[in-house]
Amino acid sequence: MTQFRRTGAAVAAVLLLGSMTLAERQTQARPVAVLRAATRPDHVLIVVLENKRYDAVIGHRKAPWVNELAAGGANLTHFYAETHPSQPNYLALFSGSTQGVRDNKCPHNLGARPNLGRQLIDAGYSFTGYSEDLPRPGWRGCTHGGHGGYVRRHVPWVNFSNVPASASQPYTAFPRDYRKLPTVAFVIPNLCHDMHDCPKANADAWLRKEFARYVAWAKTHNSLFVLTFDEDNQTDGNHIPTVVAGAGIKPSRYPARATHYGLLRTLQDMYGLRPTGLSAGAAPLRGVRVGR
């Protein structure tokens, strides 16, 4: 939102050096030169998909829009998830820790532990998570909509008591006037549109329909779009697709190693927030040229 635009912050970008093992040993992050500093984004929209390794999506003919996005944005070619199964990776991205969760069980009630949503709100910014097939704002149930529907295990903010119920919205509330977006928004598609239960072509077509216009808008409105995955298809490598597009992003392939912790650290640095958990030991994503 324009009232929150501030300058002088090192922004968005690209590649984390260093990552965590599956046991989450903290490693010393090495410094990386920033190519460009720029204004803080007015909006960052993050869409999280499910369970696909990098080469099952990037370069695959059944995901044409995702590949268009990668060709026109920053394709982070060595981005890795933290662990298996799905749920702890969402928690890592949102809070800097898997919070000791090692399963997909529901519910996990994590109390008032630090997390990105609470940090943004406390700093005077705004946060909303939009979940497809969520039946109503603030709903805390585990599943809805049957096969291909909503699952709470993919919606990390619901597990934290210090994130207001009003920050958890059905995807039907996603604003089509993008100026009304919160500072940081997550979109969690249902199990069909996130590539989990349905063919990737279905998800790719849905992504194009829902977000192609936002990506074009973001390029001229100081905003960013991040597409990432929770994990790969259960391999030890856990190599996942991640693309950044929007204002000032230089289209290219970026080969430095990156993780969800580095992505979280980037968001925290953008908005002057204190790193949480293992994001404190992760270098922010750097190297993508950002600036207007």
What are these regions (language model features)?
Residues M1-Q26:
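Secretory targeting and sorting signals
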Residues R30-R292:
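Flexible, surface-exposed loop/gating regions in the mature catalytic domains
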